[in-house]
């Protein structure tokens, strides 16, 4: 008698769930995992889907759940090198023979259809290699087909109605739970009925394992009823004395060969979905070995505002994308010039034509082209600058710009100050200090740079960009030569400082105590210095009196700071400090002039 093996059908949802579990849960863990599959009555096909990894809540009539084991290998070499014959024998002994001998088969007869599924996932290309085996012994059992000797025509409705797939028929033709088999005398001839996985003319793989069970339990003979939807088959089993044989059961591929199968989901997935998953892949791989405690969600959901869409803004935005940041907003009031594309990677030559496109909007469009799933926008806005006075005709416009800037900072979690001038950084620094927003300032010179964090209050309040100044910033943009108007720097310095800025933000999101306050770098000798500085009580931007004045008077304070030279210095105490220094009388030295002669 020949037997029809199970075939496998793995739905796309199974592979997607497996990929997610491999990336987020299993990682490098290749230990056996419990999974399940289902077969529909008389179809003979084990179906795997996303529910294969969890307990199935419902049990449809005519659908049988089969328990199994998943072995997911970390490399294709491990998959290929596994001893498939020994593997099937090992799991046949564990899953089937073990369950029969320890008695768990009586409570879980579905183990008779248990399977082993070995897989390898190429998460970069979304290619999955797999091989399913339903272990059974290659034994020549004494099986004979016999005629229907009882009134079993209603089994096709009675068994599914009980929510069972295997039952025992007692001598009075009553359908009883399979667990009753445990109490049947071994000298008796039990009758076992089950929902056949195959059509009536075929003998399912399950019969082999029922024969093994009867043999191990010590029965002399038994009757099996293969229950079909319209017709039943009856088989009579008798115990033999022959060898049990070796384990078999690996599924053949579509070419009829004993080889694994392969599925490529790449062409079936939405390209945007593939891009999103690829971004997550590179980040989540960090958690496999190097940084298992890394919190990726915090920075991912950090809404970032970039004030400045030039060289620094371009590089910062790319690094934020690489960290998986979902929302990036650009603010700039310039247009793309012909000198920009070679230094600012978000722009192209065509962006410079016809007077140049607006930088902020163009940067957002370029970022969207790189990663379409990012939420990004560009806003053309001039940041009000201390020392740049307003006129009666410009006051309304500047006031609107101020209101929009405040609204933007309030609606974001982290602010990057990436502008060209010191005075343009002053107002955002004040607002971030007042609103306690994470703020990263980056500035570059010809061969030097500084990048620092501030804005968020802590146990030890850190200084801001202006805490080392003894004067408030003023208009530094007038009366400047060409080399002073342009940012003249070594080309490699912008990517360095931008990378540092984003990494400092990431460290802040992780609450890492090692996150530096500021880094100062010098390319003339290729050195970087880590510095910590406390907040200056007379700082023109983050001192308590300045912050409180902004909270109390908002635009009134800002308007005065823009128009009245010396107002901020008087308010924060810098002017008083300067007067105190001027009044110091250093006097004459006690030694005579001759004593200092060499």
UniProtKB/Swiss-Prot annotation:
Official protein name in the record: Ubiquitin-like modifier-activating enzyme ATG7
SUPFAM superfamilies: Activating enzymes of the ubiquitin-like proteins (SSF69572)
Biological source species: Yarrowia lipolytica (strain CLIB 122 / E 150) (Yeast)
Keywords: Autophagy, Cytoplasm, Protein transport, Transport, Ubl conjugation pathway
Domain of life where this protein originates: Eukaryota
Pfam families membership: ATG7_N, ThiF
Keyword presence, Protein transport: yes
This protein's domain notes: The GxGxxG motif is important for the function, possibly through binding with ATP.
Subcellular location: Cytoplasm; Preautophagosomal structure
NCBIfam families: E1_like_apg7
Catalytic residues in the record: 486 (glycyl thioester intermediate)
Any one Gene Ontology BP term: protein modification by small protein conjugation
Record-level GO cellular component terms: cytoplasm; phagophore assembly site
Gene: ATG7
Key word Protein transport present: yes
GO molecular function (one): Atg8 activating enzyme activity
Family: Belongs to the ATG7 family.
Function of the molecule: E1-like activating enzyme involved in the 2 ubiquitin-like systems required for cytoplasm to vacuole transport (Cvt) and autophagy. Activates ATG12 for its conjugation with ATG5 and ATG8 for its conjugation with phosphatidylethanolamine. Both systems are needed for the ATG8 association to Cvt vesicles and autophagosomes membranes. Autophagy is essential for maintenance of amino acid levels and protein synthesis under nitrogen starvation.
Matches recorded under InterPro entries: Atg7, Atg7_N, Atg7_N_1, Atg7_N_2, ThiF/MoeB/HesA, ThiF_NAD_FAD-bd, Ubiquitin-activating_enz
Subunit structure comment from the entry: Homodimer.
Motif (GXGXXG motif): 308-313
